[in-house]
Amino acid sequence: MTPEFANDLKASVRAIPDYPKPGIIFRDITTLLGEPRAFRRAIDELVQPWAGSKIDKVAGIEARGFIIGGAIAHQVSSGFVPIRKKGKLPHTCVSMEYALEYGTDKIEVHVDAITPGERVILVDDLIATGGTAEGAIKLLRQIGAEVVAACFVIDLPELGGAAKIRAMGVPVRTLVAFEGH
C-alpha cells in the first residue's frame, strides 16, 4: 500500500470527538464506505495477502464487519459468516463471552456456520483492545475453524488489540493506524 493511499484512506475516515463518551474519538468508516474508490481500494488492500489462497469463509463481526466482510467474501469467492451479539441469530447458536473495558458481553454464531477445518478470515472495521476479536477467534475455533487471518481497516495500536490477536497465532492485517482512542 502506498503512503498516498494510506493518507487518502485516513482522510476518508470521519473523527467524531467525545463519542460514545467523553475523551473517546470515534473513527467512523461510513464516510469511507460512501466513497466508491476508497471503499474498493480498502477491500482490495485487505484481500491482497490472500489473493489466490483457499479461503472457505469470511466471518464478519457485527455490524460494520458485515459490510467489509461481505465485500471481502465476494473478492475471495467464499461464504460469509455473521458473528452477532447474543440473541440476534435465529438458529441454534454457539456463544462466547468476551471482555469489555468494563464487564463482559457475548457473541454468537450459528452452530453449523463452519465445517470443521474450514479456513476463515475474521473481519471488522477497527481493532482497539481486541476483546471482541479475541472472543470471535475463540468462538470460530470452538466450532472447528482454522482462523488464517484477522483484517481490520483501522488499528488503534496504543490499545494493544492487534498484538493480542497476533499472540493468539493469528496474522493481523490493518490498513491505517490512529493514535489515541
Swiss-Prot record:
The protein's matches in InterPro entries, at most eight in alphabetical order, are given as:
Ade_phspho_trans, PRibTrfase_dom, PRTase-like, UPRTase/APRTase
Per the record's keyword annotation, is Protein transport included, yes or no?
no
Q: Where in the cell is it found?
A: Cytoplasm
List keywords of the entry alphabetically: Cytoplasm, Glycosyltransferase, Purine salvage, Transferase
Disulfide pairs here are none
**Mostly located where?**
cytoplasm
Q: Which GO terms describe its biological process?
A: adenine salvage; AMP salvage; purine ribonucleoside salvage
Q: Which GO terms describe its molecular function?
A: adenine binding; adenine phosphoribosyltransferase activity; AMP binding
Pathway recorded for this protein: Purine metabolism; AMP biosynthesis via salvage pathway; AMP from adenine: step 1/1
Reaction catalysed? AMP + diphosphate = 5-phospho-alpha-D-ribose 1-diphosphate + adenine
Query: Which sequence ranges are marked TM in the entry?
Result: none
Q: Per the record's keyword annotation, is Cytoplasm included, yes or no?
A: yes
Which PANTHER family has this protein been placed in?
ADENINE PHOSPHORIBOSYLTRANSFERASE
- Quaternary structure note: Homodimer.
Q: Which NCBIfam families match?
A: apt, PRK02304.1-3, PRK02304.1-5
* Entry function: Catalyzes a salvage reaction resulting in the formation of AMP, that is energically less costly than de novo synthesis.
Please state what the protein is called: Adenine phosphoribosyltransferase
Gene name?
Answer: apt
